[in-house]
Amino acid sequence: VAGYVAYLGRYMYFDKDGIVVETSEEGTPGIPQVTGLSFSHVILHEPLPVENQAVFEDILNITQLLEKHSLPVDKIYFSPDYQVTLIFGEARVAMGPSDDIDEKIMGLQYMLPSLEGKKGTLDMREYTEDTKMISFEPD
């Protein structure tokens, strides 16, 4: 299971290909909720009908990287233009497009402890291994 989406009061769990494999009335700790995707219906054992099916490759890549670096994300948000924001409790991490996300997640593992208990947005959209450019905007 790669993640889940909320739909009509239930949680729809999907695999790496975006196929809905299970439904539940509650979320499962350790599996991120994916938000921001648009779809008009959900059918068990069929792919989620999203506009850009490639988003599931991004979701799988992101969840594997987060797991590899022991970063327990609560939600993964995709904006309409597929900009990624990771949500850890009350803190949001704006990652930007999924290009170079592995480099950003690698850097995030060292920054996340300092976000604990904070509300706001850590902006990593311009972050690279060379520039290490970030900013934090409290709520």
Pin down the residues of each PLM region.
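Charged, solvent-exposed interaction patches on well-folded alpha/beta domains
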Residues: V1-D139
